């Protein structure tokens, strides 16, 4: 079973712990794979702590609130985009606006889930982002394998 590292960034501890509880035993699988994906979940309460975490830990998926003390979530997202971190980001915020959704999408957010959300909505969004991440990595590996194969024949 492959574990994906998930960072939950929200200033509300209740939201963070609720997300962790929902995803703790949740698995995502493909019919053609033997093993499912599961999550290794970490929580932080500020944008600064999120940046510290990703600089020191491999992170696959980030669930990111926008309204954070200090650095806002959209600023964290811009940092990830500017510095080319390979992290799939799902924005989770109760302060949603069309402008924020557009800016988040332009900066690479995969999904935008407004709070409050149900456990099923969160699981569905996580299934989607996990499958997207798997397919993206598979495509990148195939592209790399193709380049190596071409190089061998040159």
List each language-model region with its residue ranges.
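CheY-like receiver
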Residues: 133-154
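C-terminal output helix
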Residues: 99, 117-126
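Active-site residues of response regulator receiver
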Residues: 10, 65, 93
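Acidic catalytic/metal-coordinating carboxylates
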Residues: 46, 72-75, 96
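Acidic, metal-coordinating helix/loop segments flanking the phosphotransfer/catalytic sites
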Residues: 35-61
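Short amphipathic alpha-helix used as the core "switch/output" element in two-component signaling
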Residues: 25-28, 52, 74-85
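Two-component/phosphorelay signaling modules centered on CheY-like receiver
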Residues: 13-42
